[in-house]
């Protein structure tokens, strides 16, 4: 049997790109400002340098204890109408559950970033990640922001520094970039994310931001981001914990030209939404692959559910089942645990027809291994099941009797 050399590569060697394609009119970077131990990057910035007005959209945590930067950024986004020119992000300290002083610190980071970026008509957003309950070393951060502002650039190295500067328990920096064509124009998307623990649907210690030089209105971008996040960052699970700080931001400056995308009923809107959704799914998958203590990357796909909401609910229930995760970790083809989770998923009774439910293990290559077909158990080839389960990545297929599009959910065990 031939063994792939990739089995012996570290996660960083497998998943951190050596080059990329980056959107026009954005400068990024990362430095050490004194939050973490010496020489570890802990402050990142993104700035629109195109000379064109940029717009931003965001999706924030659903946790009731929203961190100070989440509250401040949501407030700024609403007041500015989405006219955002820059982002500032620190790692190593979450500035969460820090009271009024924490809010003051977050606002002072925004003010310092606005000054460094020379923002006048536009504003900055702020994000933080790290330990909860401690005040920021705000003096270090405020001293670092103007220094960082002078070191921004648009190269692959600058984007990598930016990705490194937002990491906490991550074992590798997470970044993705791509080019795509729309209406005869070529555009680029680039983004970074962090997260390895406290990851579950509705996001969790998870920060991410991405930029595009495509021309899109703020309302259209918000609609696209909400759609994309629901099908990416809100469809992943590692440990089922939800954080106080998670934030995903998208910013667009239209620097590559072309007609403005604003009408949701146009092919251009649908095409851009598809590009951003696929991009977000790729970035979110890196978070799952870096899950704390994780050994496998599993995609749970539900087909023919009664509705999109039901499919997502079933997939999420299976993904967060401790018994399912235990079985997968132990390479145990105990598909009864999958069926059990499907059965207690909080969907209406008519959504799951037990006589038309099928379950399969789906390898990345080769034919699916059928475990249950229309409610009837199959004779399972245990050796083939073990071969599939020992892989780093595979899928689980659940088919119901209704005719609907498939729904994917990513879990790590």
From Swiss-Prot:
Organism per entry: Clavispora lusitaniae (strain ATCC 42720)
Active-site residues per Swiss-Prot or TrEMBL entry: 205 (nucleophile)
Record's GO cellular component terms: mitochondrial matrix
Function: Catalyzes two activities which are involved in the cyclic version of arginine biosynthesis: the synthesis of acetylglutamate from glutamate and acetyl-CoA, and of ornithine by transacetylation between acetylornithine and glutamate.
SUPFAM superfamilies per UniProt: DmpA/ArgJ-like
Cystine bridges: none
Protein's name according to its UniProt entry: Arginine biosynthesis bifunctional protein ArgJ, mitochondrial
Involved pathway(s): Amino-acid biosynthesis; L-arginine biosynthesis; L-ornithine and N-acetyl-L-glutamate from L-glutamate and N(2)-acetyl-L-ornithine (cyclic): step 1/1; Amino-acid biosynthesis; L-arginine biosynthesis; N(2)-acetyl-L-ornithine from L-glutamate: step 1/4
Single GO BP term: L-arginine biosynthetic process
Subunit comment: Heterodimer of an alpha and a beta chain.
Sites annotated Involved in the stabilization of negative charge on the oxyanion by the formation of the oxyanion hole: 129-130
PANTHER family: ARGININE BIOSYNTHESIS BIFUNCTIONAL PROTEIN ARGJ, ARGININE BIOSYNTHESIS BIFUNCTIONAL PROTEIN ARGJ, MITOCHONDRIAL
Top-level division of the source organism's lineage: Eukaryota
Site (Cleavage): 204-205
Annotated residues for binding of substrate: 168, 194, 205, 292
Keywords attached to this entry: Acyltransferase, Amino-acid biosynthesis, Arginine biosynthesis, Autocatalytic cleavage, Mitochondrion, Multifunctional enzyme, Transferase
Family listed: Belongs to the ArgJ family.
CDD domains, A to Z: OAT
PTM info: The alpha and beta chains are autoproteolytically processed from a single precursor protein within the mitochondrion.
Location(s) in or outside the cell: Mitochondrion matrix
Misc remark: This protein may be expected to contain an N-terminal transit peptide but none has been predicted.
E.C. designation(s): 2.3.1.35, 2.3.1.1
Catalyzed chemical reaction(s): N(2)-acetyl-L-ornithine + L-glutamate = N-acetyl-L-glutamate + L-ornithine; L-glutamate + acetyl-CoA = N-acetyl-L-glutamate + CoA + H(+)
GO molecular function terms attached to this record: glutamate N-acetyltransferase activity; L-glutamate N-acetyltransferase activity
